[in-house]
């Protein structure tokens, strides 16, 4: 059984993961609308990953004998000025998620809930990778600047990205 405060926070995070999936789909739509199919694919794969994270938390809540509670998902931002802005927003979103997992870890540590601490460590490791990935993309896009040929090649690279739940 989970402490109520921790359970509420896990439910909130589960819902936030599904919100993040919506936000990434909005970024994909912007990319598709502007004929950047490779970047759109990147965000579609990100959305799949966020849904996987939400489902992982859902499963954990149920495995602990608790009930997952779903809330309304707010509409994400849908207007962007550039591909770079989508990546900057993605990084900000991942940084927010990292802080949310830090707060969850603090609650689990306070309760000495070692099973939840172990569960959350996977997400903390994942967040290090996510933030680093977005930072790399932002750095690369800044270096590319207005070079449309290099942007085209970079987009083609991202078009091949796929999400694998086993990673």
Swiss-Prot record:
GO terms for cellular component: cytosol. SUPFAM superfamilies: Ferritin-like (SSF47240). Its main location: cytoplasm. Fe cation 1 binds at residues 17, 50, 53. InterPro entries: Ferritin, Ferritin-like, Ferritin-like_diiron, Ferritin-like_SF, Ferritin_DPS_dom, Ferritin_prok. Keywords: Cytoplasm, Iron, Iron storage, Metal-binding, Oxidoreductase. It is an enzyme of class 1 (oxidoreductase). It holds the Pfam family Ferritin. Its EC number is 1.16.3.2. One of its GO terms (molecular function) is ferroxidase activity. Residues 2-145 form the Ferritin-like diiron domain. PROSITE patterns: FERRITIN_LIKE. Fe cation 2 binds at residues 50, 94, 127. It catalyses: 4 Fe(2+) + O2 + 6 H2O = 4 iron(III) oxide-hydroxide + 12 H(+). It comes from the Bacteria. Belongs to the ferritin family. Prokaryotic subfamily. Iron-storage protein. This is Bacterial non-heme ferritin. The gene is ftnA.
């Amino acid at each position: 059984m989970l402490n109520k405060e921790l359970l509420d926070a896990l439910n909130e995070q589960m819902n936030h993961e599904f919100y993040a999936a919506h936000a990434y789909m909005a970024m994909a739509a912007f990319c598709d609308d502007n004929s950047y199919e490779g970047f759109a694919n990147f965000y579609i794969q990100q959305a799949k990953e966020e849904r996987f994270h939400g489902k992982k938390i859902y499963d954990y809540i149920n495995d602990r004998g608790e009930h997952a509670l779903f809330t309304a998902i707010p509409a994400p931002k849908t207007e962007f000025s550039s591909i770079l802005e989508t990546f900057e927003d993605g990084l900000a979103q991942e940084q927010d998620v990292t802080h949310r997992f830090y707060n969850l870890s603090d609650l689990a540590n306070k309760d000495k809930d070692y099973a939840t601490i172990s569960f959350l460590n996977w997400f903390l490791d994942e967040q290090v990778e996510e933030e680093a990935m977005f930072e790399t993309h932002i750095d690369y896009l800044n270096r590319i600047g207005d070079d449309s040929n290099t942007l085209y090649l970079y987009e083609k690279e991202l078009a091949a990205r796929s999400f694998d739940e086993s990673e």
